């Protein structure tokens, strides 16, 4: 297993976003957190910011959708420059999550699912055949700068 570094653009100074993207030029990916205020209590960035970042970097962009009904938006995020899109298994019905993963792959992008810290690991099983990645959250989704939850480490192995 290799380690990949994907700094979150959510931590950037948005007045200096271009400089923030350039500062992570040696990373493996750019992690792009999307929050809708419904699935998580916070609202973050969206498609126009992704389009701007795509113009500033050749790095793969990993879009983490913390939104309800992700299948409604995956095409737009893929078209805006995402290389990898992940959806939370808790964000919709299994059928709709399957649909989101299918749409992502139909756009020629990598797809994956995400688990909140307290979601049972088995929740990913119905989706594994369509996943290029499984992201296990080590903090509660929705806010940057949180403390790491040590008990999540055992779920990753």
Predicted feature residues:
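Conserved N-terminal beta1-alpha1 strand-loop-helix module at the mouth
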Residues: 1-86, 91-99, 103-113, 122-131, ...
